[in-house]
């Protein structure tokens, strides 16, 4: 087939492009759905507790994913700084996943347990009190806002529909688990669990 025919016939060119992309998708993407390594949770992965789940929602609400990624790429510079590279099995229960694509701030995929709860609270309340050159905004209202847990059980039921193994007991006790806690408690609980399902050697 001569290139001139393709160049003059946009419809034919578009059809062949769609065909090429479809074949590429079928051969590269579809097999991933059938590999256990991409859709099975890593050993030791536990569902978020009610408080951690609320913290995750606050993380999303406050736009943290706009400045922090949660995916360490398998490059030496990243693994030396952040720890073990991210694997798909860590994120199978994250709906939506929060890998992110921008790093105004550091990657948080392995931040769990790296700093104390008190450090995290101080940093979220006013980052410049802890890191003077920080560009991160302060979140003082997280200390004042209380959780009532009104929708926590419903959130867990929805997540169970996505295949996350929440038990009836988890769901029944969800409201009591978060009631009276602050949004700061919740987001710190969420941050402290990130990346803890994989043995992290730096």
Q: Each predicted region: which residue ranges?
A:
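Charged, low-complexity, helix/coiled-coil-prone segments
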Residues: 1-11, 61-71, 93-105
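Post-cleavage N-terminal segment of exported redox proteins
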Residues: 1-48, 162-167, 188-202
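Electron-transfer interface patches adjacent to heme c in soluble/periplasmic c-type cytochromes
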Residues: 13-22, 80-184
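A generic secondary-structure signal for well-formed alpha-helical elements
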Residues: 30-37, 62-66, 71, 75, ...
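Sequence context of c-type cytochrome heme-c attachment sites
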Residues: 32-43, 50-53, 69, 85-91, ...
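Electrostatic cytochrome c docking/interface patches
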Residues: 36-60, 72-79, 104, 174-177, ...
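The canonical Cys-X-X-Cys-His
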Residues: 55, 61-70, 120, 187, ...
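Surface-exposed patches in mature extracellular/periplasmic domains of secreted proteins
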Residues: 67, 133-138, 198-202
């Amino acid at each position: 087939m001569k290139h001139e025919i393709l160049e003059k016939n946009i419809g034919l060119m578009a059809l062949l492009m769609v065909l090429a992309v479809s074949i590429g998708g079928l051969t590269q993407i579809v097999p991933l759905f059938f590999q256990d390594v991409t859709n099975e949770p890593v050993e030791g992965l536990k569902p978020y507790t009610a408080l951690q789940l609320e913290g995750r929602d606050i993380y999303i609400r406050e736009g943290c994913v706009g400045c922090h990624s949660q995916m360490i790429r398998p490059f030496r510079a990243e693994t030396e700084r952040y720890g073990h590279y991210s694997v798909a099995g860590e994120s199978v229960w994250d709906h939506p996943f929060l890998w992110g694509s921008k790093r105004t701030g550091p990657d948080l995929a392995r931040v769990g347990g790296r700093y104390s709860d008190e450090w995290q609270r101080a940093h979220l309340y006013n980052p410049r009190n802890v890191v003077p050159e920080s560009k991160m905004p302060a979140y003082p209202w997280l200390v004042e806002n209380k959780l009532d847990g009104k929708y926590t059980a419903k959130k867990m039921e929805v997540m169970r529909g996505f295949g996350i193994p929440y038990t009836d007991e988890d769901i029944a006790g969800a409201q009591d688990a978060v009631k009276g806690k602050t949004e700061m408690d919740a987001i710190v609980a969420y941050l402290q669990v990130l990346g803890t399902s994989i043995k992290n050697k730096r």
